[in-house]
Amino acid sequence: RAQRRWGISAQLYSLRRAGDDGAGDYTALAGLAAQAARRGADAVAISPTHAGYPALPEHDSPYSPSSRRWHNVAYLDCDAVPGADVVRRTNGAAADVAPAPDTPLIDWPQVLPRKLRRLRACFDAWRANGEPSRDAFEQFRAAGGAALDAHARFDALQAFCIEHGIGADWRQWPAQWRMPATAEVDAFAHAHADAISFHTFLQWCASRALGDAQQAARDAGMAIGLIADLAVGSDRAGSDAWAHGTTLLRGVSVGAPPDLFNADGQAWGVTTWTPAALRANGFTPFIDLLRAAFAHAGGIRIDHVLGFARMWIVPEGGSARDGAYLRYPLDDLVRLVALEAARHRAVAIGEDLGTVPAGFRERLGAQGIAGMRVLWFERDADGAFRPPSAWDRDTIAMTSTHDLPTVAGWWRGVDLAWRRVAAGAAAKTATPHPAGDDVGRAAAAHGSAPDERNDPVLRSDAPATDDGHDTPPPASADLRAPQAERATDRAALWRALQHAGCAPAGDPIPSADTPPVGAVLAYVARSPSPLAIVPLEDLLALNEQPNLPGPPCGHPNWLRRLPRAIDALFDADVHTRIAAIEHARRTAEDDA
């Protein structure tokens, strides 16, 4: 009889720990994994750790990375990198003071530059003191080869161009700097070898820190450990696009067609390989990416795995409605995922939500790639929630995702108020979800734009974002209809909870301001799935979701921090919810 496991999902940036620099980091991740393992969790699915832009802190979307192969150095713990102990002995307490512990949102333009200053001091001290880890660094650098060198060159060159007023977007740089292998870039690298070594050092530190987090998870007893998130593409103005030239799609954005959930479709502002380039290069770029993702994880989640079959391509400057499908070699890609998962003894999960081609899920399943089943979409044609026993086997069961409402937020209708705000913003946009050029323009479904930065209430009609509130948003003329529909949906979910034995049969439905989070978590955990994943936002019964798909509307995408530090997350209420999850998982085993 197969064991029914459970895990959590976490937005890495949102984690808190004592002494952090104002944002989540790899040390907090290791601590969270160990804490969750001690409570019975077997996995921690994390937001992408792809490389961002060290010189462009306002570009904060984890799904619009500079490079998918390399790591995000913004998540480094400055006190845990080589050289940090030397800096402490030399300088004493750090001069830079971190934000107050209760800061609700990350202020990246403050946090990241300060962190880079501290990391630079550690690098200088480490190099000056001739530490024995120098050999490990050189081995990492040699193993990374030309690809690592190109990424470090990009980060150094971008910082130089920003500092000298040339701009962050490599497509606007002087022609001789628009690709890595030119004599002029070689000359820059020679003149700025120190900066390039620093950026290489940061990648080495990030690789070590992720490896340490996975080791902490396994040492604490997790069967899987970290589940890395593989974004669908990389930013068109980033390191990958600069280094890989014509092997990536140009003049278009990857996105999704209009559907029931996004009437205008989506253009995400990212690019990926052309099908021809993948074949011509023997799929080597894809294999390298998979190996990088599996290197420090017990599994991967592939964002928008539907793109393995066909990718919705949107013309630059056009709307997502102007897009068309570009076909990809599905069977080759899924076989390579299966091969690398087997080589790394890891699990592979495909985010298969959206417009799914006929037979697609069966082809994924045949190669051992598990799809995702999310509570909000597990409904019959009449609106009834499907009982857990009817959920697909060999898939991953989830209450929600980063793009969807939390359980508490859905029950209270918080998402309805935000959807109204987002719809108003979309109506004021001349071209919905444009696939523009600007560096830092976030994917419509996966990011935030500069005018949202650190401010959840830029628009006067934005709903409250305090997770402490315990009343639903007030009804307005344009909210009464969706709120009435939500009341019907709450009743349907409550009936489903009762029929599944997750809520007392004779109890009346809880009010809109009393979400039955524990019962809902147990309901999802009752599915026959081998792994149920619970977002931390649901384990903590928070109201707000990490990201709101759509145009900029004041929602603080990818900026919210958890309300408590990792050492204080698992309080009595959370323990009660975990007990309900574990009981439901055992019940699912007995029903198998």
Annotate each PLM feature:
Residues L540-L569:
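Low-complexity, glycine/alanine/valine/leucine- and proline-rich hydrophobic stretches
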Residues E131, F137-D186, P258-T271, P275-R301, ...:
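Active-site cores of enzymes that catalyze phosphoryl transfer or operate on phosphate-rich substrates
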